[in-house]
Swiss-Prot record:
Belongs to the metallo-dependent hydrolases superfamily. This is Alpha-D-ribose 1-methylphosphonate 5-triphosphate diphosphatase. GO terms for molecular function: hydrolase activity, acting on carbon-nitrogen (but not peptide) bonds. The gene is phnM. Pfam families: Amidohydro_3 (PF07969). Its EC number is 3.6.1.63. Keywords: Hydrolase. It comes from the Bacteria.
Length: 378
């Protein structure tokens, strides 16, 4: 397959030319047009590496499309997979939560079904994107460590993050923001919210630290990439570094982001944060970190289509120094390197032919086609 007449987004530059794919890999690319009649006309669009998503909880929405509504696993997985490739994502780490911030939540009920669906569809080769597992460990929960010890042995596990959403710290250092979020999410009265908050504080005091240390030790032993989550202080970051974290997910302050970078951790922020112009929790904005050169990876988090959109917005933003190739690395090369996936994330000879062809119309990025290992999947 030859793709002609495209703007190739390479590691350090954008060049007009063509690209050849053979046996699922990029065979060659050139700053010239192919004269072969079978070459596909890219119509001057951008040709980028396939996007790599490290943290999406999008799968949850398809298994439970409405409260108390369970959807068949095969259909849910297929719909989620289709949305991933339609967003330009060719490698996706499906983030599933171990432990829940509230007993009786849908997360724990769906956990085994979601993991089984990911494993089975990958083995059968029916997925359009490549799906792997990101285990999000909610530390203040008594079931978290036993579940993790069971699930960490599953083949697709590629990344583990350590989360603590208890009130008064990290993402919810502002207790009013915490109450506003969870009271609205669970439709609690003021009295119920007060009880819930007290229960979460007690659980955190009992379980967070021992679970954090035990899970990190298991990740180091198995050489599984570890991510911190919502670090807010120098002390948080120092502990995350000591535990072996290679990614700092959603640091909530400038201080935490800067300290993470100094410790050699990749700073990951939400693409929706870029698109919306700030954090929904009132924490440090991803655009501010981009201005300071402290942004390494973007994740679509809860909105898959935000990933490519955010990369172009970063490149357009005159307040930072990101070129388009540098901005595209936030969603391609950098996440690949953080997970040691050396076969993808860049347009280069011998690399996987995971590719996205997109056009820009009225300041919006439209995805035309997506290929994974040379096979068109969108």
């Amino acid at each position: 397959m030859i793709i002609n007449n495209v703007k190739l987004v390479l590691e350090n530059e954008v060049v007009s030319g063509s690209l050849e794919v053979q046996n699922g890999e990029i065979r060659a690319f050139a700053e010239s047009q192919s004269r072969l009649p079978e070459a596909m006309d890219g119509e001057g669009g951008w040709l980028l590496p396939g996007l790599i998503e490290l943290h999406t909880d999008n799968l949850d929405k398809f298994f439970t499309p409405r409260p108390k509504v369970d959807w068949p696993a095969h259909s849910a997985m297929s719909s989620h997979d289709a949305l991933m490739v339609a967003s330009g994502i060719t490698t996706v780490l499906d983030a599933v939560a171990i432990g829940d911030v509230r007993d009786g939540g849908d997360r724990l009920e769906n956990l085994e079904k979601m993991i089984n669906a990911i494993e089975e569809t990958q083995k059968r080769g029916v997925n359009r994107a490549e799906h792997r597992l990101h285990l999000r460990c909610e530390l203040p929960h008594h079931t978290t460590l036993p579940l993790f010890e069971k699930l960490v042995q599953r083949e697709p596990v590629t990344l583990v993050s350590l989360m603590d959403h208890s009130p008064g710290q990290r993402q919810f250092a502002n207790r009013e923001k915490y109450r506003e979020y969870y009271q609205g999410k669970y439709s609690l009265t003021d009295a119920q919210m007060q009880q819930y908050e007290e229960e979460q504080l007690a659980l955190a005091a009992r379980w967070s630290q021992p679970n954090r240390e035990s899970i990190a030790a298991l990740c180091r032993a198995r050489k599984i990439a570890l991510a911190s989550h919502d670090d807010a202080t120098h002390a948080h970051v120092a502990e995350s570094h000591q535990l072996g974290s290679v990614i700092a997910e959603f640091p909530t302050t400038f201080e935490a982001a800067e300290a993470s970078r100094k410790h050699g951790m990749n700073v990951l922020m939400g693409a929706p944060n870029i698109v919306r112009g700030g954090s929904h929790s009132g924490n440090v904005a991803a655009s501010e970190l981009a201005q300071l050169g402290l942004l390494d990876i973007l994740s679509s988090d809860y909105y898959p289509a935000s990933l490519l959109d955010a990369a172009f917005r970063v490149a357009d933003d005159q307040s930072n120094r990101f070129t388009l190739p540098q901005a595209v690395k936030l969603v391609t090369k950098n996440p690949a390197q953080a997970l040691n996936l050396q076969d993808r994330g860049v347009i280069g000879e011998g690399k996987r032919a995971d590719l996205v062809l997109a056009h820009r119309k009225d300041n919006h990025i439209h995805i035309d086609h997506v290929w994974r290992q040379g096979k068109r999947v969108f």
